[in-house]
C-alpha cells in the first residue's frame, strides 16, 4: 500500500475488511499484478498505461479553431443545436431527456453538500462494483449507482436549465468520489469493470469542465487519464484491433481527456496519439482478437457477438469518425472504409432488425439490434465530403420500413447513461439530417455474402 506521490504520511481508513479464500481476477486491484500478455486481452495493464511517456513519432499540428470544431461537435452532440424543430423524433428525445433529468434530480436529493473542518466531504462510504450489496444488513452505496443515475442528469440540468445547485452538487460529488478513492492510481479492487460503468462521470466532466477550478480540473484530468487508460494511445500495439468493451465505453472518454488538456502542445500530442489509436483499434484484427474482422463481421470474447459489444463498438467508432472528420485528426480513409463496410455487412445479415440467432453470444433474447445502429450509419455517411450514397440508401430503407417504426420509436424514447451514454438530442438531430437528404432508399437486399469468420 503506497501513499500518493505528493504525500509522505497520512491516515488510512478501512470501511470494510473481508478475509476470503478466493479472489476473482476481476475483483483484484489491477495495480497488484504484472501483465505478461502483450495482446489486447481483457487483462488491462493500468500501471503500464499510466507510466507510458506521452509522446508520438510525429505530432499532427492544428490551429485552435480546428480543435474547437471537434469540441463544438461533441458539445452539439450532447446538447443539440438549440434550434427549434418540429420533428417528432427530436421532440420525443427532448421530452424523454427531461424525464431523465428529473429522475436524476430526485435521486440526487438524498445527497447533502456537507464538508468537515478539514474540507473533506462529510458523507457515507462509497464502494466499487465488486463489493457486496449489503454488509451486516446495511445497504452499501456504490460509485456505479451515482455514475449511472445522478451525475449526468445534474450536468445536463446545469447546461440546459442553468441550475447552479446542480453544478454545486456535481462538484461536491467529485470531491466525495476523490475522497473515497476515485483518483489517479487508485485500484479500488475492481478496475477491470469499474471503468466500463462510469459514463456519468466521463460525460459530466466534459459538460462541466469549464466550471472547474484549475486545481480541480487538474485533479480530475489525472483521474480521467487513469480510468480511460489513455496511456494505451501512446503505446505501439503488436497488431491491429481493440477489445470492444474499451471502444464502446472508453473511446469518447479518451477523446474527452485529449480535448480537455490546456497546454496546446500536449493537447496536440494527445489528439495525435488518439487518432493513431483509433485507426489501429478500427483496423482489421487478426485471429480471435477483437473487434473488426477481415469479412467485416465483429468479434468479442473471441467469437462473433452481434447482440452486444460489436454493434456498440461500431457505434463508438462511427461517432469518433464524425467528430474528427475534416480536421487534421480525421480518421484515415482505410478506417472509414472499414466502418462503412462493417455497417453494410451488419445490415446484410440481419433479418429485419434481427441478427442471426447463432451470433448472439450469451444474450439469446438480444437478436433485435439493427435499429440502434441507425445513428452510426448517419455518423459515417456524414463523415464524407458528401453523404455516402450506399450508407444513406441502406439507412433510409431501414428507417422508412413500416415494420421497423415501433422499434425505432422505442430507441428514440430511451434515455440512459448506463455502460455507454449515446441517447443525446444531437444523435437524433444527425439522424434526421441524413433522413432529409434526397438520396433514395435502397431496394430490398438480396444475394449471397460469404462470411468466413461467422459460424452459424
Tell me the role of every PLM-derived stretch:
Residues 320-454:
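Extended polysaccharide-engagement surfaces of secreted carbohydrate-active enzymes
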Residues 30-95:
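Extreme N-terminal leader/anchor segments
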Residues 21-30:
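Short, charged low-complexity linker/loop segments at the C-terminal edge of domains
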Residues 1-19:
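Extracellular beta-strand ligand-recognition surfaces/modules
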Residues 67, 71, 267, 391-392, ...:
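Short amphipathic alpha-helical segments that mediate assembly, nucleic-acid/protein binding
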Residues 62-66, 163, 263, 388:
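Short, solvent-exposed helix-helix connector turns and helix-capping sites enriched
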Residues 76-377:
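Aromatic-lined, polymer-binding surfaces characteristic
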